[in-house]
Amino acid sequence: MLSDCLLNNFRITAQIGSGAYGLVFHVVDILTSREYAVKTVFKSSSMDEFYNKNGLNNNSQVARTTLLQTQLYHFFKSFQKKLFLPSVDLDSILQLTENELNRLPHYREIAFQLRVQSHGNIVKIHQVLESSIATFIVMDYYDRDLFTSIVDDKHFVNHGILIKKVFLQLCSALDHCHRLGIYHCDIKPENVLLDRNDNAYLCDFGLSTKSKYLAPNVCVGSSYYMAPERILYCLNTTTNGIHVDECCSSLPTDTGDIWSLGIILINLTCIRNPWLKAHQKEDNTFQHFANDNNVLKKILPISDELFTVLTKILQLNPYTRIDMKTLMSEVSSLTSFTREGPLSQVPILSSEVYMTHIIRNENLFLSDLSHFSADQEQQQQQQQQQQQVQEQEQEQKQEQIQNQEQAQQQQEEEDAEPESDIPSTYNSDGSMEKYEYTNNHNNSTFLTSSMDSTPYQSDIDDVSASKDCKFQQDTLRNRLLCLQMNFSTLTDGPNEKWLPDY
């Protein structure tokens, strides 16, 4: 119906969302080709006038959406489908007082979002265009929300590290809001957008407040994610000993957002809600949980680790709920989300990886985060291996010192033994052979050997020494034979057989 309508330099391409008092469109800047989302917030006075004029009521969501589309279409048509609207200075919106915001309630959402949008995981407002029937808010565009990714795409089924990344980014954004005194009050998957790199962005501050304490008789947000103290029907009940209708004004607002985070964590890990409403009289499951929190382990496939964290988040008494910093730390340290399946083992994220690669890097891919986590584990393994190598080297050094001491002691014992005049040599098997002279001149063998049965281990490979000694033995034998023959010639006369033949 509104396709191709021009809003200043933005061309409307499609409607991507709707609410009680507004519509959301996908637009393209015709000058830069950049995509944006434009939220159209209708002024309550114009809506009441339109309903009264047509005799209609706004009870049906479909009826409301149709009426909003029709009214906006006629508005564009009256200007030939081209609107040129003035842009409101964003700084001037931040300067609006509380009284001025009360007179311009549709600007309260804009002012709160502008105040906190410096965080990297909160959707940013770029322009605010004003008309007589509606205010147009130009914001960042992301093509999917957390609800679609969880339920329709099953995007988190096998990715424990991705669950940590998205959940911690959401916690960080919400913690930033709380520190600046803004409480969202409508945390749910539909209000969390995701980019192509699976980074999360908090949006829709339409129900947010600056009040630190709950306003009496006020019930806001989706019943699936609302804390029990925020539900209107709890006003006549007691919550863990606290009578809500008597001290509703003293109950903190921020802990209600933390409760909603706990339900989202269950959505991410189990793809379901634990109950329809956190009300003991209207929801049987929640009533059983209020009596015994172990019911969570019976209805959900969660691990003991995750159960421990959830019991700290889903405290019925808002004053005893876990704080944001502790929650972020404990989720970072979880090693499992479920008892079985791919989420039964989840990498631990160190504070360095979390601060550097989750919060500060908006363009981080999941593969990069897995790589950082794997590098951390690899570094730990390398450190363990280096420590083992050092221990082995130290053991080897001690062993060498002991061997040297033993060798030195053995050498000293050998040096203390008397030296023998008998020549010796070594056989190929390492045993020592001793040679002794004899006085038998008639025996052609002048040397006899006796074998020492004990091998000399230090020279067991010295084969060449044995061969040299044998050669010397043969040479000495030949010389002795010659001397013997010469001696017989001198005593018995010449032997003709011995004389050379001339």
Curated annotation (Swiss-Prot):
Residues 10-338 form the Protein kinase domain. PROSITE patterns: PROTEIN_KINASE_ATP, PROTEIN_KINASE_DOM, PROTEIN_KINASE_ST. The active site is at residue 186. GO terms for cellular component: cytoplasm; nucleus. ATP binds at residues 16-24, 39. It catalyses: L-seryl-[protein] + ATP = O-phospho-L-seryl-[protein] + ADP + H(+); L-threonyl-[protein] + ATP = O-phospho-L-threonyl-[protein] + ADP + H(+). Keywords: ATP-binding, Kinase, Nucleotide-binding, Serine/threonine-protein kinase, Transferase. Gene3D superfamilies: Phosphorylase Kinase, domain 1, Transferase(Phosphotransferase) domain 1. May have a role in glucose regulation. This is Serine/threonine-protein kinase SKS1. The gene is SKS1.
